[in-house]
UniProtKB/Swiss-Prot annotation:
Coiled coil: none annotated. Keywords: Repressor, Stress response, Transcription, Transcription regulation. Gene3D superfamilies: 3.30.450.40, Heat-inducible transcription repressor hrca homolog, domain 3, Winged helix-like DNA-binding domain superfamily/Winged helix DNA-binding domain. InterPro entries: GAF-like_dom_sf, HrcA, HrcA_C, WH-like_DNA-bd_sf, WH_DNA-bd_sf, WHTH_transcript_rep_HrcA_IDD. It comes from Streptomyces avermitilis (strain ATCC 31267 / DSM 46492 / JCM 5070 / NBRC 14893 / NCIMB 12804 / NRRL 8165 / MA-4680). This is Heat-inducible transcription repressor HrcA. GO terms for molecular function: DNA binding. GO terms for biological process: negative regulation of DNA-templated transcription. The keyword Membrane does not apply. Belongs to the HrcA family.
Length: 338
């Protein structure tokens, strides 16, 4: 167990290295921080921290830099979450409030996170495996052509055009709309197939072909939309950190192109807590020089998806964690109000 003084020395090393991008020496630490001890004592503390794997010497005659283990201790014990200022919170809310639909919410969230943290932002669309149907709208476009509009509880809207096998009157369409919503509104996607399986029997024989076509389109839409989707932005920010990656940023960029990798990085959508994965804690080798900060978002207490950022391990953890948490909270509020 490290002493309080050595924890303070580690905190100072992390803060200085993140701020200056330069290895940190004992003389600089005593000049910049009120540690209350001599440079010689700080050197001894740094030697102990190095022996225990919390800091390392990148070059001979250079200062020290934090290791993955050092960053982990900093995040777990030393770094609080930096709160956003009042003006920052208002700017976030005003920017997100301008969104017109779910795609716009996700797009604005990605841009906002990338701008606030100057990292790569990743936002997962709400997981429809946990979504419920808010409403199904059916609109007549022609005697034998119908538009189906599926609206979910998370604000997601999907539209499908349906060519009916026979003309379908307004009265029949209104009847189908009412019967359909009475069965599926407020129900989870997984329950819908069983709820509508005998619905066509309530209609006249000449209309059953069209009803079956509409129901098949609805079920196909539900299956298609349960696929996980995400949006990524701010990859250009990585070019500012070229020297933070041991060889090249290419493995990082390749990893960011793999949706499966990103979904695993963000973790389970049902876990709403803040997660910080540092360096080699990331299972994907191409991301061993990065850190991932993610958190769940959603309406109410249940998280429906994750959002987060990817950047070098030399990251402003308190500021990044604060920005990610604040943005997630506002996105959740928008979903709840939509």
């Amino acid at each position: 167990m490290l002493s309080e003084r050595r924890l303070e020395v580690l905190r100072a090393i992390v803060q200085d290295y993140v701020g200056t991008e330069e290895p940190v020496g004992s003389k600089a630490l005593t000049e910049r921080h009120n540690l209350g001890v001599s440079p010689a004592t700080v050197r001894n503390d740094m030697a102990a921290l190095e022996d225990e794997g919390y800091i390392a010497q990148p070059h001979t005659s250079a200062g020290r830099i934090p290791t993955d283990r050092g960053y982990r201790l900093f995040v777990d014990k030393l770094a609080g979450v930096k709160p956003m200022t009042g003006p920052e919170r208002r700017a976030i809310q005003n920017f997100l409030d301008g969104a017109v639909d779910l795609d716009d919410v996700v797009g604005r969230t990605v841009r906002l996170l990338a701008q606030l943290t100057r990292q790569v932002a990743v936002v997962q669309y709400p997981s429809l495996t946990r979504s419920t149907v808010r409403h199904v709208e059916l609109l007549s476009l022609a005697p034998a052509r119908v538009m189906l509009v599926l609206i979910t509880d998370t604000g997601r809207v999907e539209q499908r055009m349906i060519d009916c096998p026979a003309p379908f009157g307004e009265t029949s369409l209104a009847d189908l709309r009412a019967r359909l919503n009475s069965r599926v509104a407020g129900r989870r996607f997984a329950d819908v197939p069983q709820l509508v399986q005998d619905l066509s029997e309530a209609f006249d024989p000449e209309d059953r072909g069209t009803v079956t076509t509409v129901l098949s389109t609805l079920l196909e839409t539900l299956v298609e939309e349960t696929e996980e989707r995400l949006m990524i932005g701010g990859t250009a920010n990585l070019t500012r950190f070229g020297h933070d990656f041991p060889l090249t940023i290419r493995p990082v960029l390749e990893a960011l192109e793999e949706q499966v990798v990103l979904l695993k990085l963000l973790g389970s959508a049902g876990d709403s807590g803040m997660t910080v994965r540092i360096g080699h804690e990331n299972a994907y080798e191409g991301l061993n020089s990065t850190s991932v900060v993610s958190v769940g978002y959603g309406s109410g207490d249940e998280a429906v998806a994750k959002l987060g950022v990817v950047g070098p391990t030399r990251m402003d953890y308190p500021g990044t964690m604060g920005a990610v948490r604040a943005v997630a909270r506002y996105v959740g509020q928008i979903l709840a109000e939509s």
